[in-house]
């Protein structure tokens, strides 16, 4: 793999280790998972927790956001799939600005676009198409973001 991040290197190492020492294991590659309880310091977490968010590269970085319910279905699928490595990924890429604008529709937020591409940013997320993609009808980002805010409304969580 061609990665420079410690996260990417550790994922690759884990896959290699499993292929040598645990032949029956299925490695699951998850891509930009989001849902009602976002992990700290992810894009969705910043959008939900902050009033002002800065998007580098003018929000044009491209990502494949995968809703958490789809990840759960994919992990269940992985249990008996007899494949060494699979992708659990919504392969409909969107810009980070588009994703942020979906959140902004439901929550007041100021989005600052910064015209700076940082050295460690990947402009476009790459999904290795040679790795098997779990066949699901993945949740669109529009529907996923709506689900998040419907859940918050149901639980009476406001800003």
What are these regions (language model features)?
Residues 55-159:
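C-terminal substrate-binding subdomain of Rossmann-fold SDR/epimerase-dehydratase oxidoreductases
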Residues 12, 16-63, 68-70, 103:
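NAD(P)-dependent short-chain dehydrogenase/reductase
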Residues 4, 29-31, 89:
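Active-site beta-alpha turn of Rossmann-fold NAD(P)-dependent dehydrogenases/reductases
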Residues 2-3, 40:
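Active-site loop immediately N-terminal to the catalytic Tyr-X3-Lys motif
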Residues 3, 7-11:
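Active-site YXXXK catalytic motif of short-chain dehydrogenase/reductase
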């Amino acid at each position: 793999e061609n990665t420079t991040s410690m996260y990417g290197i550790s994922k690759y190492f884990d896959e290699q280790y499993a292929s040598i020492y645990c032949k029956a294991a299925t490695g699951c590659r998850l891509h930009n998972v989001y849902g009602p309880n976002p992990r700290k310091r992810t894009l969705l977490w910043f959008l939900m927790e902050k009033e002002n968010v800065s998007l580098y590269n003018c929000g044009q970085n491209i990502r494949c956001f995968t809703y958490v319910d789809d990840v759960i279905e994919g992990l269940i699928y992985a249990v008996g799939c007899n494949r060494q490595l699979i992708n659990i990924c919504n392969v409909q890429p969107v810009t980070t600005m588009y994703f942020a604008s979906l959140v902004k529709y439901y929550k007041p937020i100021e989005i600052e676009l910064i015209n700076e591409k940082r050295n460690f940013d990947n402009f476009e997320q790459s999904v290795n198409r040679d790795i098997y993609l779990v066949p699901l009808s993945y949740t669109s980002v529009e529907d996923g973001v709506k689900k998040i805010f419907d859940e918050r409304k149901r639980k009476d969580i406001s800003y």
